[in-house]
Amino acid sequence: MEVENFTDCQVYWKVYPDPSQSIYAIVPFLTVYLFLFFLGLFGNVTLIYVTCSHKALLSVQNIFILNLAASDCMMCILSLPITPITNVYKNWYFGNLLCHLIPCIQGISIFVCTFSLGAIALDRYILVVRPHSTPLSQRGAFLTTVLLWILSFVVTLPYAFNMQMIEYTEERICGYFCTEKWESAKSRRAYTMIVMLAQFVVPFAVMAFCYANIVSVLSKRAQTKIRKMVERTSALESSCAFPSHGLEQYENELNEFLDKQEKEKQRVVLQNRRTTSILVTMVVWFGITWLPHNVISLIIEYDDTQSFFRLYGRDDYDISYLLNLFTHSIAMSNNVLNPVLYAWLNPSFRQLVIKTYFGDRRKSDRIINQTSVYKTKIVHDTKHLNGRAKIGGGGSHEALKERELNSCSENLSYHVNGHTRTPTPEVQLNEVSSPEISKLVAEPEELIEFSVNDTLV
């Protein structure tokens, strides 16, 4: 008789169908999850491969980004395939051991992901807002990532410990499901609130605070830089009195310089706007992708009658699984966007990816060297300007031209730096007044801004 009952039993989703099993739901979600799986895995594996292939890229910031990419890969492998299967078929096919292990690893990867986003925001905050404080070292970054994994494991441990594989008790239903089984509903709800705070509220608050301050500081520095360029231009216009006997090229050089200064101002404004947009996107995207999933989980947790998501009070109109799939897929889109926001938008990294996969490896090494040399050169050039060769010839016309150029250069340097500075005799007007002058006479805070912007964008 027992054999007959077992033979006649059916799986849960056939006895209690719901909208998540509709072909109109399965096909779109299958497409979305396949897209998130392959694109997320490709993006994060590429990020890890390119960064680890070039030791010069193992900076403090990139160590945290590597940590983020590793957790994203874990979510792509474990959360993206398994969660939709269990939501649609309401059955656990992976055995008792994996009932404890897979949810544990899923939880750890999610916590490491959100904790890493908070760590990246804090590191950038210290670099930009508190530039004179001691920055985190590579060793400190590695220790921080280890602590993040340990903390994630500790927070996830109660969840994994209380997971159990339970057999369906109804006679006509056969199969098992893997679910939480706590001693009391009170303890389960308390843990749910802790998870929501640790996984969403705290990281979101940290990111919002850090990036709001970074945007404020970078905007002020951009305004200061533009103001200095305006003062520099005014000083040059008032200092350079060109002779009226046919030296029109001087006026052409001045006009050319003014055009370059105007383009440089526009570049600073656009770069600041772009950086602001990226930082705001990071915070907003994290909020809109993780908030719905947390809200749905919270409602399900406190819905004792399990009727909140039942339309018309009917079991076959229970949309809780459908909503859970929808919000989960939105949350998992972070796996695709994180490599884009934190790596691909960096032009240097983008070139490295292209050169690594499609070009000469030596060219990608040169990109790294050029980036590091460029940042070093900014600081070095504040102490010394390398001029070109003197203008040759000893005629009166050439001598007059040289005196006028030197006079403009001396007056310009005085107005820019706020104190008398003897320029290198070889430096000419069209060299001193190039767009790079804003970097050559930049304050320490401005230099920090350039290097941090390289990291941000």
From Swiss-Prot:
Biological-process GO terms, alphabetical: behavioral response to ethanol; feeding behavior; G protein-coupled receptor signaling pathway; negative regulation of protein secretion; neuropeptide signaling pathway; regulation of muscle contraction; response to oxygen levels; sleep
Record-level GO cellular component terms: axon; dendrite; neuron projection; neuronal cell body; plasma membrane
A Pfam short name: 7tm_1
Major place of residence: membrane
Keyword annotations: Disulfide bond, G-protein coupled receptor, Membrane, Receptor, Transducer, Transmembrane, Transmembrane helix
Residue intervals on the Extracellular side: 1-22, 84-100, 162-193, 301-324
Transmembrane segments: 23-43, 63-83, 101-121, 141-161, 194-214, 280-300, 325-345
CDD domains: 7tmA_NPYR-like (cd15203)
InterPro entries (UniProt xref): GPCR_Rhodpsn, GPCR_Rhodpsn_7TM, NPY_rcpt
Annotated function: G-protein coupled receptor for FARP(FMRFamide related peptide) neuropeptides. Activated by FARP neuropeptides flp-18 and flp-21. Plays a role in modulating social and feeding behavior. Required to modulate locomotion quiescence during the sleep-like state called lethargus, which occurs during molting between larval and adult stages, in part by regulating touch sensitivity.
Annotated family: Belongs to the G-protein coupled receptor 1 family.
Name of the protein described by the UniProt record: Neuropeptide receptor npr-1
Organism, scientific name: Caenorhabditis elegans
